[in-house]
Amino acid sequence: MIPVIALVGRPNVGKSTLFNRITKTQDALVADFPGLTRDRQYGHAQHENKSFIIVDTGGIGVDDIEVDTLMSRQSQVALNEANVILFLVDGRSGLTGIDQQIAQALRKLNKKVHLVVNKTDGMNEDIACADFQSLGITDVHAISASHGGGISSLLEEILEPFTTETHEATDDKAIKIAFAGRPNVGKSTLINRILGEERVVVYDMPGTTRDSISIPFTREDKQYVLIDTAGVRRKSRIDEKIEKFSVIKTLQAIKEAHVCLLLLDANEGITDQDMNLLGFIIESGKALVIAVNKWDGLEEDHKEKIKSELSRRLHFANFAKIRFISALHGSGVGGLFKDINEAYHSAIQSFSTPKLTRLLQDISAKHTPPCINGRRIKLRYAHLGGHNPPVIVIHGNQLDALPESYKRYLNNEFIKHLGLVGTPLKIEFKGGQNPFANKKNKLSQRQVNKKKRLMRWAKSKK
């Protein structure tokens, strides 16, 4: 299971800054496209090939809320799900009474807690940390969230117990499908419809009701595992913070899956919660199929309105197939597995270096890269850098100056010519390095003698 790291601390100690710093340490699969919203209370991050989910529990001890609310429902869910807790304090302000109360509450959780002393830039780290020795937390780290100091070593230590997991499946293994979406969007109805059609005898439901439910079954001699996730609910005013953490199980299921099936409600259209979930799926690089449920019985003008909204708001996910279905009546459900298999096989495909290089040459010849300071950017060769999602590594010169518009052009052309369906594509650029950079030019003996003659001649002319 993907580890969960929770950030805890009083307000203004730098939790949001650290959260943003950590979630941006990975090479983002997608840019912040207009219209793609994210709930920044949780996020996906990666450090040295180890993926994890990070959660910001918000400030404690503000707005006249007692520190005991740490143990209340609004933070209890997140802290119970967390594998590691990072307790942030302010190295400049020193130890406060609220810090002491939070530490006392954390001790009751029986969780691994790391004390993170923030804002230590320009300070003696030992002196800054010494003020917090009375809290009795042995694992202490001095960092600067705003400047990035100490964060890499912090992540390295807290992730050390967790193994590097790869989720590249082969054809002889079951394809894991995560059914994601808001409550009442029809996830369970759709799964029951699929199971009913396939007449599955085995129905395994491990864990508690709060856990994701994994259901193995066979369809046309292929093995699948359906993962019924907890719904991402709309945030009410009272339970706003509670609802932010109800998504953790869903996010873990998405990270474990090979393909994500995002279910939307045709009656409600695309909500902010849908966009949050879609953003996380794309960030995670997962193969994706979108199903618009409750399509039966809608007026034609409403159907056209929904299609227009999908085209307008989901342009950044145009690689994904969209199906219009009715989980209750079964219409359109049969075509979902065709899309799921296409997306899965696109995500794990392999391409040879000669094929990718020839394709790169054809694409760049069709629309040549721009010139920078009178020199044209050169794209030399390409090779495969990974699977699920597919990663193509392009080598060349002056690639740092390659415009974003041309990068999008390359991405779209590779997707089209490789026939990728239902999976995002990541392209990495690596510029050529001068092998003689920072090396002193060693002269031959003949060149040394000539240099001496020139120097003697120059002196004789003075």
From Swiss-Prot:
Coiled-coil region: none
One Pfam assignment: KH_dom-like
GO biological process terms, semicolon-separated: ribosome biogenesis
Keyword line: GTP-binding, Nucleotide-binding, Repeat, Ribosome biogenesis
Binding annotation for GTP 1: 9-16, 56-60, 118-121
EngA-type G domain location: 3-166, 175-348
Molecular-function GO terms, alphabetical: GTP binding; ribosome binding
Top-level taxon of origin: Bacteria
Domain KH-like residue range list: 349-433
UniProt-listed InterPro entries: G_ENGA (IPR031166), GTP-bd (IPR006073), GTPase_Der (IPR016484), KH_dom-like (IPR032859), KH_dom-like_a/b (IPR015946), P-loop_NTPase (IPR027417), Small_GTP-bd (IPR005225)
Residues the record lists as binding GTP 2: 181-188, 228-232, 293-296
Subunit structure: Associates with the 50S ribosomal subunit.
PANTHER family (alphabetical): GTPASE DER
Family of the protein in this entry: Belongs to the TRAFAC class TrmE-Era-EngA-EngB-Septin-like GTPase superfamily. EngA (Der) GTPase family.
Functional description taken from the UniProt entry: GTPase that plays an essential role in the late steps of ribosome biogenesis.
The name this protein goes by in its record: GTPase Der
Organism per entry: Legionella pneumophila (strain Corby)
Phylogenetic lineage: Bacteria, Pseudomonadati, Pseudomonadota, Gammaproteobacteria, Legionellales
